[in-house]
Design a protein with these regions (language model features):
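Serine-esterase "nucleophile elbow" of acetyl-processing enzymes
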Residues: 25-79, 83-91, 119-127, 131, ...
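Substrate-gating cap/lid alpha-helix
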Residues: 184-222
Length: 578
């Protein structure tokens, strides 16, 4: 065991040990019963939302109940609280009537506009029988002062939920899940050691236990077990102290399944990989429905005039494709595979979208020397063609470029812009490297560093790899074997908004310290959970992310429509272009 894992605050350690000995991890002895075709919906914060990227909980459930044909959907999102669950295409961020009385510091007019369904409407659409709610992490940063307000907010949420009949027949079974403990990684990374964080997380866990007992709903204490894991495991279980990694989520999946539904054997264990792959496939399509990229046109302020002509059909189709993947999961739990392409071919056909291009002008695209002849440059400057899509067909829709220390040109391309369309092949945007190997001033070699991406509108180099904007996520791509191809992908932070895809975090630029500045445009509502607390922003501005500290901060919030460039002068002043 490392020294880091041995060092625990005495007061906190004694308190935790007593709590674990007395109450275990689950309050209310009655486990929630699984019925055939049970509809299970996850709501809440980043702890729940991030599960969609790993898929272990859903996999565990399908392996334990292969004949139950479970329907599982994840509605969780970064920054959510019981009452505050904002969305760029909703007129109100409040999850239920009266919720505005609690998180009053967040009750700012954010300009969100649209007809995206409310939380209750979504739960009704999904016919929720069981609701698993993850709360308490964001709220814990309000400390002791915010504890009573949180209990009142959670109480109001529970009472509201238990009055609903989302499935049209009876009230939902509700399980409250506490935050996990904060893992001390400070010996390896410049991160908080978790002492203060865990003091607050423990308080908020106990508050959730109290509210659950008062309302006779199931409560799962995730704080105590994860604290024990950190003390006994030889491997890290989080990426940055508060976000579980793959191993962490594998353990967490079993904790959730046991604690909420009771201990059951994984009767389809031999099909785990097949089921896990099917779950991740389903989650990809569900994400493109519930968190639809470019939703400003599907539900938001840009819905008119063209949204009604296009998006209702695409949404219907992607929901059919998601349902097909539910069937694929059920088959996988029996060891069977499914021809997804054949099934997708039977989903609704999308009507032809008529162009609004009027054909004015010649519309001729100039290439090579013909284009250079038309461009005027300042005195003392020279413009030459380095690489073109005529020579490199992957060079389509380039959006950001940068030279590395070897003099190679890296380009992010996004032929999938503006977003994935249901029925098309999955996006295959790329990060490309171009080299001039014979020193003639023109690129003659292309290397695909990464493909299978979606809208690479920002990237920046770092010693540990390349940070890339990917819709709602900031990811890190690593080349661990030196072949100039990414072989590791890590989701660093989530909760960024891609409501208008070309407004999402972009135009990455590093300052002299190695921190990365990122631009964000209007209409967006970003809510990112970090080791230091939630970072929120609306309607344009700029972020600074320090990889050394895993620290994100909002450096400016201003109504900037399309920020497409960031630069620094000799005095370190920032210049923003839009």
């Amino acid at each position: 065991m490392s020294v880091r894992r041995k060092v625990v605050g005495l007061k906190f350690g004694l308190m935790l040990g007593i709590a674990m000995a007395i109450v275990g991890c689950t309050d209310k002895s009655d486990a929630i019963r699984i019925n055939k075709e049970s509809h299970i919906v996850l709501i809440g914060n980043n702890l729940g939302s991030r599960m969609m990227n790993f898929g272990h909980f859903e996999t565990e459930m399908h392996l334990r109940y292969p004949d139950s044909l479970l329907f599982i959907r994840n509605m969780a999102d970064g920054g959510n609280t019981p009452g505050f669950r904002p969305h760029s295409s909703r007129n109100s961020p409040w999850a239920f009537p009266g919720a505005e009385a609690f998180q009053t510091e967040l009750a700012q007019k954010s300009g969100s506009i649209g007809h995206f369904e409310t939380e209750d409407e979504w739960l009704t659409r999904l016919k929720a029988d069981v609701i698993i709610a993850f709360f308490g992490y964001n709220e814990s940063f309000q400390g002791k002062e915010g504890l009573e307000n949180y209990k009142e907010e959670l109480q109001a949420f529970v009472q509201h939920t238990l009055k609903q009949t989302y499935n049209g027949k009876n009230t939902p079974k509700l399980a409250l899940v506490s935050p996990i403990a904060f893992e001390d990684l400070s010996a390896k990374m410049d991160l908080p050691n978790g002492i203060r964080e865990n003091e607050n997380l423990s308080l908020y866990t106990e508050a959730m236990r109290e509210v659950a007992a008062k309302n006779d709903v199931l409560f799962l204490d995730a704080f105590a077990p994860t604290s024990k894991w950190y003390a006994t495991e030889t491997e890290d279980l989080t990426a940055d102290g508060f976000q579980l990694n793959d191993l962490g989520y594998q353990k967490f999946a079993k904790l959730l399944a046991d604690g909420i539904f009771g201990k059951h054997k994984s009767v389809a264990e031999s099909h785990r990989k097949l089921v896990h792959d099917a779950v991740l496939e389903k989650n990809w399509f569900w994400h493109n429905d519930f968190k639809i990229p470019n939703g400003v046109h599907a539900y938001g302020r840009r819905y008119d005039p063209f949204g009604p002509d296009n998006y209702p059909y695409e949404i219907e189709k992607i929901r059919q494709m998601t349902a097909i993947r539910d069937t694929a999961i059920w088959k996988a739990s029996r060891g069977e595979t499914m021809d997804l392409a054949a099934a997708d071919a039977k989903t609704r056909k999308l009507p032809e979208v008529k162009t609004n291009y009027r054909g004015d002008g010649e519309g001729k695209y100039l290439y090579g020397q013909e284009a250079l002849d038309k461009i005027s440059v300042a005195e003392g400057y020279k413009l030459e063609l380095f690489a073109s899509e005529e020579e490199f067909e992957d060079l389509a829709n380039p959006v950001q470029m940068s030279f590395d220390n070897k003099g190679r040109l890296w380009v992010g391309v996004m032929p999938s812009y503006p977003h994935y369309k249901a029925g098309d092949s999955k996006p295959n945007d790329k990060l490309l490297i171009f080299e001039d190997t014979d020193n003639d001033g023109k690129a003659d070699k292309q290397t695909v560093f990464a493909d299978g991406l979606h809208l690479t509108i920002g990237f920046e180099f770092a010693p540990e790899g390349v940070y890339v904007s990917q819709g709602t996520n900031l990811i890190l791509l690593k080349d661990t074997d030196g072949d100039d191809k990414a072989d590791v992908k890590e989701i660093i932070l989530s909760g960024f908004d891609d409501h208008d895809t070309h407004h999402a975090i972009s135009a990455f630029a590093a300052d002299p310290s190695g921190a990365i500045y990122m631009a964000e445009g209007v209409f967006l509502h970003t809510n990112v959970e970090t080791a230091y607390g939630p970072v929120r922003g609306t309607n344009g501005g700029f972020y600074r992310y320090s990889p050394q500290r895993h620290h994100l901060e909002r450096t400016a919030q201003l109504p900037i429509p399309n920020p497409w460039g960031i630069a620094f002068d000799d005095w370190g002043q920032q210049f923003f272009a839009h």
